[in-house]
């Protein structure tokens, strides 16, 4: 079984995107990440959930913590904003084949439960954690808050 490091995006004073009715990305990210962490643990994986409450962790510390913990895989949970729909997984330029395969497998699973397919995308802005972790890594953008 794998050691999987899960990061619920944003937290604390950093709400991330804010949607209709004040819905905050940080709250959804924590809820989704916690649910996935529970499922992965039940399947026999060892999981480290970066935060389990509403506080902010610096991106440099997130990458450092995942690396020091010795994770086999890193997954960050976020939400999109800007008036679209669907889910996408992000990887960085030069991502490993395993990162690409993991992102594609997650993307396929999201589409399988009803998300519109926005694909696996290469993104190099605001990706400090993905580019500074030593294990295969992806960010999941789980739909839009708005």
Residue spans for each PLM region:
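Glycine- and acidic-residue-enriched helix-capping/strand-helix junction motifs
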Residues: 16-31
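Short, surface-exposed beta-strand segments enriched in small/polar/acidic residues
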Residues: 4-17
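Active-site-proximal helix/loop segments of hydrolytic enzymes
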Residues: 2-3, 27-146
């Amino acid at each position: 079984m794998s050691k999987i490091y899960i990061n619920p995006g944003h937290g604390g004073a950093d709400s991330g995107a804010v949607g209709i009715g004040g819905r905050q990305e940080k709250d959804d990210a924590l809820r989704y990440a916690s649910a996935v962490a529970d499922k992965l643990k039940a399947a026999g994986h060892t999981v480290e959930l970066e935060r389990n409450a509403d506080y902010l962790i610096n991106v440099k510390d997130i990458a450092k913590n995942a690396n020091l913990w010795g994770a086999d895989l890193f997954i960050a949970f976020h939400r999109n904003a800007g008036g679209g729909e669907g889910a996408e997984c992000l990887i960085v330029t030069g991502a490993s084949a395993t990162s690409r395969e993991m992102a594609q497998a997650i993307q396929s699973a999201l589409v399988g439960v009803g998300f519109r397919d926005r694909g696996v995308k290469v993104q190099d802005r605001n990706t400090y954690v993905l580019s500074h972790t030593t294990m295969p890594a992806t960010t999941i953008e789980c739909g839009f808050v708005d």
